[in-house]
Amino acid sequence: EVNPDINVNVETYAGGELGTTFNNSASAYEDPTPATENAGMTDKFKYGEYFFERSYTQNSKPFNGLGPLYIRNSCMNCHPGYGHGKRVDRYRADDWGNGYLLVVTDGKDNYLSSLTGMPQTKAVAPFKAPIDEDKIKIDWLPYTDEWGNKFPDGETYSLIYPEVTIPQDARSEPLEATYNQVVTPVNYSDVVVLLESTIGIYGTGLLDAIPDDSLKAEYARQEKAGVKLNPAIFANGEWTSLYKGLTGKQYPKRYTYALTRSSIQDGPGANAIWNITNVTRSDRRYHYMTDT
């Protein structure tokens, strides 16, 4: 085996027996899992790395087809070292490590349908991006929590949160939301802009491994404890919506910022690598764009 047994208790494996690497160097988070290597799938892992690490362009093969609108030109831009994005003070798609994605809603948690769920701020000529990222403003403001930013032993801590502003002259698309299949104008004063940040690639398989019944039990436990849950996902001890997978089978939602996906094969990365760059493929002959 590529990764033979070593004298370590299994319960200490952070990623379980199939997913723990014992490389403690700076490249540890970029490793294939032992299960991947022991199954003889290293080549497939490397092919995946090619897609993940390369920058896409408009014309240079084989990593061509960027745009016409896009969010980033590579996965690594948002996931430096396969990790999560870093905190930044401005929104620039080309800034290395900026893992932020914009979330633009009508103020009632409904995404604007005139923009893509992950709004695009880049375009290839002669196209124009729907949002001028140079005009996006990010302010980090101090925040005081319900405990007064203090631990029980008296130690204090500081918190900050982002306030994002996109001025009216920064957009080239109308402000619209769709309610019951009816496109409706949204007032600029009602628009709310939030930031979604990328997560680390490592560990996402562990989320996929959580049994569906265990996920439901945790939702029920939190609901019973009085935690405010999204009624569009779970209410009164039951799922109120499920995700229909590629096979037609329904699963609880567990992936993406908006909980729109259920399986890692049809979830983060599997779709984002195409949506982020807007590259098409032989079985995906469409772009990530709105009708607007």
Segments from the language model and where they lie:
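Bacterial Sec-dependent N-terminal signal peptides
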Residues: 1-16
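Extracytoplasmic redox metalloprotein regions
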Residues: 22-24, 28-45, 53-292
